[in-house]
């Protein structure tokens, strides 16, 4: 049987294809070995994962102080004049300084409280790094005509303990200030006009931050004077919220200015008093 040209071309083609396939297989095998070698060399330069993890675990702890209490800003307290002096600062107020320096100031105080003898004036401790200036009384401010009072009475015979009370009212934005009582300003930092204040309902009516760890009281009183803040209805709502928070968290009971139980009807009556006061003030200005 003779093999023709066609058959020879087929045989040669098969041999060529087989050679190409063999050469490709050989090259592929060699490239895998080189790739593995490169990977081995690359990973050999990386730090050991276990050592890195151990370093993280054994490294120095990083403490995040998430609870920083704002500093006092005694800016513009015309009706509560007192000679400031340098005093001891509580640890909680010292931690607050850095955070509160960035807070914007929001307005001027428009609250004159020359009333109750319960709130006797005296020198105050101002936790401020800058030298304090003597606060002078603004004689142009009108006298307080009405005072809205909400008292919180402790149900416990031991009363409200100083540290817990301080923590609670700081969370509500009150800051220690003039006359050694607490004030709620427009800003949580203690800047801007005073919205309302809180005093110790037990004589002499003040708080001693230097001895707050041993302090306790059976009752505190929140009060808002009229004329006072520019937006008295909103300020009153903030005061109600602060009083309710204290009563809820420290087991207290809300009382009105007659020491009767504070009800929703009483709160609405207070709001109506504010509306009536604003109406009278508007009428007087127009007259």
UniProtKB/Swiss-Prot annotation:
Tell me the gene name: zipA
Q: Which NCBIfam families match?
A: septum_zipA
Q: How does it assemble?
A: Interacts with FtsZ via their C-terminal domains.
Keyword Transmembrane on this protein?
yes
Enumerate the transmembrane spans. 2-22
Q: Which residues lie on this side of the membrane: Cytoplasmic?
A: 23-287
Alphabetized UniProt keyword annotations: Cell cycle, Cell division, Cell inner membrane, Cell membrane, Membrane, Transmembrane, Transmembrane helix
Alphabetized PANTHER family for the sequence:
CELL DIVISION PROTEIN ZIPA
Question: Where is the segment annotated Disordered?
Answer: 48-140
Q: Which SUPFAM superfamilies match?
A: Cell-division protein ZipA, C-terminal domain
| Entry's localization field | Cell inner membrane
Family assignment from sequence similarity:
Belongs to the ZipA family.
Basic and acidic residues bias: where? Answer: 64-77, 85-104, 121-140
GO terms, biological process? division septum assembly; FtsZ-dependent cytokinesis
Instruction: Give the membrane topology.
Output: Single-pass type I membrane protein
Protein name as it appears in the record: Cell division protein ZipA
Protein's organism: Pseudomonas syringae pv. syringae (strain B728a)
């Amino acid at each position: 049987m003779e093999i023709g040209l066609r058959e020879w071309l087929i045989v040669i083609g098969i041999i060529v294809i087989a050679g190409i396939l063999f050469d490709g297989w050989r090259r592929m095998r060699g490239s895998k070995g080189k790739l593995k070698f490169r990977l081995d060399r690359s990973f050999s330069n990386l730090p050991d994962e276990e050592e890195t993890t151990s370093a993280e675990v054994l490294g120095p702890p990083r403490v995040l102080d998430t609870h920083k209490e704002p500093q006092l800003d005694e800016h513009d307290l015309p009706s509560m004049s007192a000679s400031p002096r340098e005093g001891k600062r509580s640890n909680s107020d010292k931690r607050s300084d850095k955070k509160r320096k960035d807070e914007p100031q929001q307005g001027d105080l428009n609250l004159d409280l020359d009333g109750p003898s319960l709130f006797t004036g005296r020198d105050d401790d101002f936790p401020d790094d800058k030298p304090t200036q003597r606060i002078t009384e603004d004689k142009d401010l009108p006298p307080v005509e009405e005072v809205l009072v909400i008292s919180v009475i402790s149900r416990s015979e031991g009363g409200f303990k100083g540290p817990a009370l301080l923590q609670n009212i700081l969370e509500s934005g009150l800051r220690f200030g003039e006359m050694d009582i607490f004030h709620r300003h427009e800003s949580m930092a203690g800047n801007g006009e005073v919205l309302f204040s809180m005093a110790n309902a037990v004589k002499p009516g003040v708080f001693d931050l230097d001895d707050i760890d041993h302090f306790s009281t059976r009752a505190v009183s929140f009060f808002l004077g009229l004329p006072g803040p520019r937006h008295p209805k909103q300020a009153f709502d903030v005061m109600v919220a602060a009083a309710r928070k204290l009563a809820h968290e420290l087991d207290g009971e809300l009382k009105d200015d007659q020491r009767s139980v504070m009800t929703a009807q009483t709160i609405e009556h207070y709001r109506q008093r504010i509306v009536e006061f604003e109406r009278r003030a508007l009428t007087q200005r127009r007259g």
